[in-house]
């Protein structure tokens, strides 16, 4: 079973941003972009949780930046594991940026799960 645990709308005006965070203990999180990306708009990004622990060689080879920016497209839904660190950069536009975000929990059918364990 899939259960939407929370849903909320975010409105970003000039100077607004969202600090780096995750959505534990949920399983999946998502964001629906209500606007296309425009210049100076806040940008959704994923943050590499262990970036500061990487050696310079690994950073140069595989992770040149600690953040991966996702271009917003109106109507696009982005799903990701809730443990992934993410945020929104500072919004520097006079045009409002809008999103709808949500958390999802996956609920196992405990009765069927127990039956499968007894097969061994």
Protein language model regions, located:
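HATPase_c (GHKL) ATP-binding subdomain of two-component histidine kinases
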Residues: 102
């Amino acid at each position: 079973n899939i259960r939407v645990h929370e849903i909320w709308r975010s409105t970003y005006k000039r100077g607004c941003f969202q600090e780096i965070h995750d959505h534990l203990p949920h399983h999946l999180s998502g964001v629906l972009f209500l606007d296309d990306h425009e210049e100076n708009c806040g940008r959704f990004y994923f943050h590499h949780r262990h970036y500061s622990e990487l050696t310079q060689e690994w950073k140069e080879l595989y992770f040149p930046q600690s953040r991966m920016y996702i271009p917003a497209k109106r109507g696009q839904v982005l799903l990701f594991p809730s443990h992934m660190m993410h945020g929104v950069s500072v919004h520097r536009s006079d045009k409002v940026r809008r999103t709808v975000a949500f958390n999802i929990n996956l609920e196992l059918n405990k009765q069927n799960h127990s039956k499968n364990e007894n097969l061994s």
